[in-house]
Amino acid sequence: MTETAFETALAARTSDMIDACTRCGKCVEVCPVTGPAGVGDAAPQDVIGGVIDILQGGEGTAASLAWAKGCALSGDCIEACPEAINPRFLLAMTRVAVARRAVELRERRKTGIEHFRLVADGVKVLSSVQLTDDELARLGQKVGARLANGSTAKEGERPDFVFYTGCNVLKTPHIALYALDIMDALGVTYKVMGGPNHCCGVIQLRTGDTEVSGRQATSSLDRLAEGKTGVISWCPSCHVQFTETTIPTIEKMRGARPFEMTPFMLFLKPHLDRLRPLLTRPVAMRVALHRHPGIKGVTEAGIELLRMVPGVEIVDLDQPAVGLVGNALNALPEYKRSLHRAEREAAAAAGVDALAVIYHVDYREFCAHERDWPFRVVNVLEIVGASMGLDHATGFKRLKIMQDADAIVADCKDMLAARNIDPALAREVVLKAMLNEQPLPLGR
């Protein structure tokens, strides 16, 4: 099968990194998941050497395969590399190579389509039962009278930024609405893009289908290049997919970077002095922050933001910070459960009022635990919003705590009817995209 231009450039980038890699093993030495992933006592030099062997068409070693499959995208390896290459990207390409050899393209493509539909159905159903038409329009999912074309810029003008939601935050849309409220308060103009129509391509990349992944990502990238100052991202998975795979590959193809992409929390940093006076209402709360190190600076920005809120006391639970985001640990389910359990117990022992998360994935996985533990589960932006006098309903949490698919569908029957959504489809989504997404079982 003929390679696309994107695939050729992607392969060239991989080859360049392979050539630059000295097999020193420092990336393996700093990785926090070598133990849980089953790397064992293999020498770090041999582990990275096995990864390179796989990328060059070899079989690698059991330890190198385990490391690649268990990668949680923590990112420690990137800073540790003395050659300034990206081991996290090389591990992604290793998983692509393994998938290609193990499964025929037709089956991989079918799997990619199935996974994409699962996300698309989840986004459609779960956003539709929580949002009004105006709110859907505000999030770029429906053109409405309030927000023509999803942009807050004046007619005929380009917005300051494109705010790229990704797909899955639309399942917990109150988080994205708070982000828009904050940008409105700062006087920043933006156009909201996201959802399945602006897919980042990571779903297809995970199946080893670089052709479809590249095509989807490139199409989305070209549409994202509307902001005067770049793109603000919310989803960490989309951010890594674009900044480590798509944008550098497009740059290699076209000779120029189309735009810079900045995570929302890092976008806020230079605006904190303007945001501080808007935080007028005290929020008396002892808060522990669930942390992920995968995108450098995001956790620190979250802590800095919480410290600005009057009345908030930050409690350090002294727990490990691992992975890009919660679902990046899905290949290591027992390890993930142990991390979640230890954090819940530490939060309860510390007497916190709330366990706060930054990312939507963690919110979805954690929120129903509020039923059984003596603290709330909130997103950081909910706390900021409360101090600004803002409030959005947390419909996802309310529904998930019911823990009954039929009761949830019955609760949403009017919204489902208004949006012409089949209750049978809604029930399937509730099971797969809500109730089954519970790494640590409820209860204590």
Regions found by a protein language model. Name each.
Residues 192-194, 233, 260-263, 315-317:
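General beta-strand structural signal in soluble alpha/beta enzymes
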Residues 1-12, 41-62, 174-177, 329-330:
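Short, charged low-complexity linear segments at domain edges
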Residues 2-3, 12-13, 62-63, 163-166, ...:
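A short, structure-level motif marking secondary-structure boundaries and short turns
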Residues 18-36, 68-84, 165-170, 196-208, ...:
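Local cysteine-cluster metal-coordination motifs and their immediate loop/turn environment
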Residues 258-272:
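Catalytic core of nucleotide-activated saccharide and alditol-phosphate transferases
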Residues 1-29, 33, 99-108, 156-159, ...:
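Iron-sulfur (Fe-S) cluster-binding modules
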Residues 202-204, 271-274, 325-328, 387-390:
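Short, solvent-exposed polar/charged micro-motifs at secondary-structure junctions
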Residues 18, 48-241, 245-246, 268-271, ...:
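Iron-sulfur-cluster electron-transfer modules
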